């Protein structure tokens, strides 16, 4: 007799079922911040259940006043892998999101070499997007072969910030790195006054380049660098500028920088960085 599986949003009563899953993830942050996730207005978490047991968990986060939905936090019980549980969980979630009149885009960010996750996303009809490299600059004394220069001039005027950010819709990253781990389509819905006011903008002397640095927390605190070109090492003062921001925030563990595939190739020496496996962004517009 076939056992019925069902997908349902998680509530406080589901914590024991979540903790009983064998995911192989030590100190899983989803368990650690479970209550925060299920109580949030911008995050949803769902479970795939069979006879009261949770086989998989996953959900989404909303950005840009609900215009963008990023799938994530997918975990499966290792005792029931390769049974299609991830797709079984995510398909109704994606269907629900595309029925939501507020949502215009659904996406997911996964490791380039995570072929199992990529197969799931392709089954969900999400399209491949750019490959991105997330590096954290932690040892600036090891930086070599970059053009030194003065710290770029800070831009504090809100209107000037808007003009700058609207000038780079077509950029070499192919995305807007909204938060650490969360690259999104470059869209005005993300550029609220509040977001821009909390972001530090710096412009180089000939006004041909600018960089945005915003404090962000993903377990640790980072100076999150948003730069839309691939010439990090050729722009005088670029590294002095982002290190200036880090020095103003000594509690940060480093400068998190999103590099395109081409920008990553241009790095002469990776020793100053913590280097993650490359990521691929998937997504689909309505």
Where are the predicted features?
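Conserved beta-strand in the GNAT
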Residues: 47, 53-61, 70, 203-216
């Amino acid at each position: 007799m076939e056992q019925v599986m069902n997908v349902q949003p998680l509530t406080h009563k589901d914590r024991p079922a979540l903790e009983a899953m064998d995911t192989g993830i030590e100190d899983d942050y989803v368990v650690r911040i479970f209550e925060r996730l299920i109580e949030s207005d911008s995050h949803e978490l769902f479970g795939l259940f069979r006879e009261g047991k949770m086989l998989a968990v996953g959900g989404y986060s909303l950005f840009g006043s609900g215009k963008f939905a990023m799938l994530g936090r997918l975990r499966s019980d290792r005792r029931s892998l390769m049974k299609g549980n991830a797709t079984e969980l995510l398909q109704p979630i994606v269907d629900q999101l595309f029925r939501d009149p507020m949502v215009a885009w659904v996406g997911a960010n996964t490791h380039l070499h995570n072929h199992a996750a990529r197969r799931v996303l392709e089954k969900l009809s999400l399209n491949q997007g750019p490959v991105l490299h997330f590096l954290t600059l932690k040892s600036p004394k090891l930086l070599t072969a970059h053009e030194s220069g003065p710290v770029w001039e800070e831009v504090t005027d809100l209107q000037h910030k808007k003009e700058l950010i609207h000038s780079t819709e077509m950029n070499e990253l192919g995305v807007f790195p909204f938060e650490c781990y969360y690259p999104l389509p470059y869209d005005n819905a993300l550029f609220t006054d509040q977001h821009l006011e909390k972001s530090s903008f710096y412009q180089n002397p000939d006004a041909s380049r600018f960089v945005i640095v915003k404090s962000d927390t993903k377990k640790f605190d980072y100076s999150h660098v948003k730069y839309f070109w691939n010439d990090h090492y050729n722009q005088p003062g670029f590294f002095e500028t982002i290190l200036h921001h880090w020095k103003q925030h000594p509690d940060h563990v480093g400068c998190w920088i999103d590099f395109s595939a081409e920008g990553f190739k241009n790095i002469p020496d990776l020793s100053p960085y913590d280097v993650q496996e490359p990521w691929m962004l998937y997504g689909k517009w309505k």
